[in-house]
Amino acid sequence: MGYTSKLALKICLVGLCLFSTLSAEHLEQKGNYIYKGEEAYNNKEYERAASFYKSAIKNGESLAYVLLGIMYENGRGVPKDYKKAVEYFQKAVDNDIPRGYNNLGVMYKEGKGVPKDEKKAVEYFRIATEKGYTNAYINLGIMYMEGRGVPSNYAKATECFRKAMHKGNVEAYILLGDIYYSGNDQLGIEPDKDKAVVYYKMAADISSSRAYEGLSESYQYGLGVEKDKKKAEEYMQKACDFDIDKNCKKKNTSSR
């Protein structure tokens, strides 16, 4: 399936999608500006969203530092500016916002707006995990898996993924599924397609395009489950519904 290396590149940015951990209840509790910013962002009214986050900052809502930093990192509603993104993530850290530590770690990992420093990235990811930010376990685990900023240690990587999984993180289920799908000599894990499918199904229950994609391929080729072309197409359609540009192309390829 070859997920792991490709997935790692994507998951290293965990925490930079805008509203991955914000509930409507939380937003309403904190005030209008962040909630209105979310609505504007979801409607692709990015300039309005950025304006609301700036107002939220003036209103003392420190989480808005992270959200505005992400806008600058992605160039949505404001000019793309990695240095400004770093400044806002740093302000979030100064206000002890767990997600700020994680996102600042990503910037150091990628060398965006700051000199690349993987050891510093690991430090920020670790602090974010200690403060309860679940996505940081994924980032920290990948650093251990790839030996970046720390010695390569698959056992510690897997431990991070399991901690994230127990907190309901979808990416953790997928990464653990990948490990069982391909096997891992360092962990003494033989390829186990059956167990991989179990993890992919759990991720799909939480809803994830990559999990549905994994299930589609498993059913298409009879890997860990009985071969079933119809189910393969159904799961790929669900993956397509999540990520139309990527997964619809894969759907067309796998149907051949």
Where are these regions (language model features)?
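Short helix-capping/linker turns of helical repeat alpha-solenoids
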Residues: 28, 40-41, 58-62, 74-76, ...
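Alpha-helical segment of the N-proximal tetratricopeptide repeat
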Residues: 29-55, 59
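TPR/TPR-like (Sel1-like) alpha-helical repeat modules
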Residues: 226-244
